[in-house]
């Protein structure tokens, strides 16, 4: 999970730079989905084959809608509108969504520590978005629409982690990913193909092609392989906590490449979100409370 979060953190500035140089957001999502499907089906030829029941194949389609299509479309299009720093910071809100959805769906208790963590994390997200709203139009700062889309990506992925946690534990990472990416490709292709056609490929630089290659191979294939492997043995909240690394990596790389501007409010937002998520992760689960009685 740590490796996946690090690769994803680096993907934000590289993906942003690719979208600044001729690759539109919808096309980049299509490249990720189609590239991921191709790589996972090829890789599955070299691992032990698993039989998947028909009901689970249908469930993989629903999982693909939440975990891939909604998540990647919202995040990538949001990243094209906002700064890599904002996108990276917003990814740290996922554990907060995990807490809320775990309470609603899995009936996990909301303790005072959890409640304080949610409040602090929400405050950090609001500060980040309000900063973008005040400074919209300033190069490298971001946009309210982009921030909200990135936030929606975290919500859709948290729904996927919570709802399909049992499904993921029944199969290997290769089986899960090859079916999810296949479904996502079939569902997204009719809508995304016009955006791919609109790209002037002859005008794209080698640097941009390499950035897209990183997004597909490392930011998609490797990351989802590592993430699913971790998800099979970890709880949704623990999986989501590794998003800590993403804003750290994204911020360092973005500022180094001159892709984003760093403001004081970004520091405050990061501190609030980190403290909030730390409190959420440190709080007791339903099982912990039951065992202590």
Task: Describe the residue ranges of each PLM region.
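Hydrophobic/aromatic residues within transmembrane alpha-helices
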Residues: 18, 28, 32, 78, ...
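Hydrophobic transmembrane alpha-helices of multi-pass small-molecule transport proteins
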Residues: 40, 61, 110-133, 188, ...
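Helix-helix packing/entry segments at the starts of transmembrane helices
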Residues: 30-31, 72, 87-93, 163-186, ...
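Specific transmembrane alpha-helical segments of multi-pass solute transporters/efflux pumps
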Residues: 7-12, 41-91, 127, 216-234
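Glycine-/small-residue-enriched transmembrane alpha-helix faces in small-molecule transporters
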Residues: 1-27, 31, 138-166, 186, ...
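Alpha-helical transmembrane segments of compact multi-pass small-molecule transporters, enriched
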Residues: 35-39, 90-104, 119, 183-187, ...
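Transmembrane alpha-helices of multi-pass small-molecule transport proteins
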Residues: 20-70, 97, 156-163, 178-196, ...
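Juxtamembrane helix-entry segments on the extracytoplasmic side of multipass membrane proteins
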Residues: 22-30, 52-58, 130-156, 193-213, ...
């Amino acid at each position: 999970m740590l490796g996946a979060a690090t690769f994803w953190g680096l993907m934000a500035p590289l993906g942003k730079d690719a979208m600044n140089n001729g690759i539109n957001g919808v096309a980049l999502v299509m490249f990720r989905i189609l590239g991921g499907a191709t790589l996972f089906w090829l890789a599955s030829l070299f691992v032990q084959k698993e039989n998947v029941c028909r009901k689970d194949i249908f469930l993989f389609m629903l999982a693909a809608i939440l975990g891939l299509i909604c998540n990647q479309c919202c995040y990538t299009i949001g990243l094209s509108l906002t700064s890599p720093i904002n996108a990276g910071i917003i990814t740290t809100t996922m554990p907060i969504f995990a807490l809320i959805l775990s309470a609603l769906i899995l009936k996990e208790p909301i303790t005072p520590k959890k409640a304080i963590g949610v409040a602090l994390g929400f405050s950090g997200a609001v500060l980040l978005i309000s900063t973008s709203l005040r400074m919209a139009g300033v190069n490298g700062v971001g946009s309210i629409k982009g921030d909200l889309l990135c936030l929606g990506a975290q919500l859709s992925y948290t729904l996927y982690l919570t709802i399909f946690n049992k499904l993921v534990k029944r199969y290997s990472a290769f089986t899960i990913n090859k079916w999810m990416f296949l479904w996502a490709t079939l569902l997204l292709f009719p809508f995304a193909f016009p955006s791919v056609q609109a790209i002037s490929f002859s005008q794209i630089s080698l640097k941009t092609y390499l950035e897209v290659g990183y997004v597909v191979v490392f930011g998609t294939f490797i990351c989802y392989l590592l993430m699913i492997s971790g998800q099979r043995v970890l709880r949704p909240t623990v999986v989501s906590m590794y998003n800590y690394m993403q804003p750290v990596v994204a911020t360092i790389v973005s500022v180094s490449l001159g892709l984003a501007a760093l403001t004081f409010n970004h520091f405050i937002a990061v501190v609030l979100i980190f403290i909030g998520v730390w409190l959420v992760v440190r709080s007791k689960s339903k099982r912990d409370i039951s065992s202590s009685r």
